[in-house]
């Protein structure tokens, strides 16, 4: 009997990024189904998907990946949604000498200064997003405020965006927790920073 191919999927089944997590899970299942012609087998070996909920929390994601490698004996893992969770998971892949395919977290540091040889990614990173957005309004006399989530995704994204700007000026950076539902105070700080600036004003939300 050929040995099963076990793939760990660590994603936000619950938590603030649940919507992205559901998309990731659906994409992985559809992709495997398509790639195997609906058989979920490769060379006679059955593909088994082991799903783990990181809850959008770095410590939970780290322990869930460790469990997938050690207890479930997965051959490789996919995930997570959150960049903060991804950064916590990177050393686990290295310690276990097993592949982690990061999807869809985009922080530059995942495949930048925090990268190790077991880490791959299928999507773009923050710098690529930033370069495209900066090209759209990087002009003299433009004032820009940023509004981002206060963790690796938001902070890496703002840094990449600032690095891509050559002419426009960043006049304010606002970071809010991922579970924020009342933006009144943060928005007011943005408006106060922008109100007396001449020329075109842009709020860039990450």
PLM feature spans:
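Short, low-complexity disordered leader/linker segments with a strong preference
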Residues: 1-6
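Local beta-strand N-terminus motif with an aromatic residue
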Residues: 7, 74, 198-202
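Beta-alpha junction/loop-to-helix N-cap segments that form part of ligand/metal-binding clefts
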Residues: 19-26, 34, 38-112, 122, ...
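Redox-cofactor binding/interface segments in oxidoreductases and associated redox assembly factors
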Residues: 9, 79, 204-205
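Extracellular/periplasmic Venus flytrap/periplasmic-binding protein
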Residues: 63, 108-109, 117-206
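Cofactor-binding loop segments of dinucleotide-utilizing enzymes, especially the Rossmann-like FAD-
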Residues: 12, 54, 149
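Acidic/histidine-rich, surface-exposed loop or edge segments in extracytoplasmic proteins
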Residues: 7-16
């Amino acid at each position: 009997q050929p040995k099963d191919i076990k793939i760990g999927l660590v994603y936000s089944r619950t938590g603030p990024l649940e919507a992205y997590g559901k998309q990731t899970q659906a994409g992985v299942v559809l992709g495997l189904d398509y790639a195997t012609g609906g058989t979920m087998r490769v060379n006679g070996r059955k593909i088994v998907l082991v799903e783990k909920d990181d809850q959008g929390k770095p410590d939970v994601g780290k322990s869930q990946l460790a469990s997938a490698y050690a207890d479930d004996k997965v051959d490789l893992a996919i995930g997570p949604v959150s960049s903060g969770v991804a950064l916590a998971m990177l050393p686990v892949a290295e310690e276990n000498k097993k592949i982690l395919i990061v999807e869809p977290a985009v922080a530059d540091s995942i495949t930048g200064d925090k990268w190790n040889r077991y880490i791959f990614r299928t999507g773009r990173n923050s710098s690529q997003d930033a370069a495209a957005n900066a090209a759209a309004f990087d002009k003299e006399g433009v004032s820009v405020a940023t509004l981002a989530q206060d963790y690796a995704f938001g902070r890496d994204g703002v840094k990449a965006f600032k690095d891509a700007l050559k002419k426009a000026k960043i006049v304010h950076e606002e970071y809010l927790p991922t579970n924020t539902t009342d933006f009144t105070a943060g928005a007011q700080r943005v408006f106060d920073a922008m109100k007396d600036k001449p020329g075109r004003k842009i709020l860039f939300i990450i």
